[in-house]
UniProtKB/Swiss-Prot annotation:
This is Small ribosomal subunit protein uS8. One of the primary rRNA binding proteins, it binds directly to 16S rRNA central domain where it helps coordinate assembly of the platform of the 30S subunit. The lineage of its organism: Bacteria, Pseudomonadati, Bacteroidota, Bacteroidia, Bacteroidales. Belongs to the universal ribosomal protein uS8 family. Coiled coil: none annotated. One of its GO terms (molecular function) is rRNA binding. It comes from Bacteroides fragilis (strain ATCC 25285 / DSM 2151 / CCUG 4856 / JCM 11019 / LMG 10263 / NCTC 9343 / Onslow / VPI 2553 / EN-2). Keywords: Ribonucleoprotein, Ribosomal protein, RNA-binding, rRNA-binding. Signal peptide: none annotated. GO terms for biological process: translation. PROSITE patterns: RIBOSOMAL_S8 (PS00053). The gene is rpsH. InterPro entries: Ribosomal_uS8, Ribosomal_uS8_CS, Ribosomal_uS8_sf. The keyword RNA-binding applies. The keyword Membrane does not apply.
Amino acid sequence: MTDPIADYLTRLRNAINAKHRVVEVPASNLKKEITKILFEKGYILNYKFVEDGPQGTIKVALKYDSVNKVNAIKKLERISSPGMRQYTGYKDMPRVINGLGIAIISTSKGVMTNKEAAELKIGGEVLCYVY
């Protein structure tokens, strides 16, 4: 697989479109960090790391509105890819839907949102947009 992050986002997107409650994805440290950010920002209900085999899996419980069954995630968009990396400095940090969404950035200090990276004044690779 050439782009495991794109595969992870696609699995989440497909589960959302199929109205699944839980999706299971192969684990990696970067996927764990992205999942943690999605949980902290309220885009997913819960997550659990399951140690099975050499890699393990991440079980992600998707978050839906209880009244009209609308998902908390409207769009997951991969920005940087292995063939064309997209980097940004802290002064040029992207604003997703005028601050309503988040950009997930991989920095030298770890994976964080665009707002956290701007506060720390560090740039990095723009992994994806979530809104």
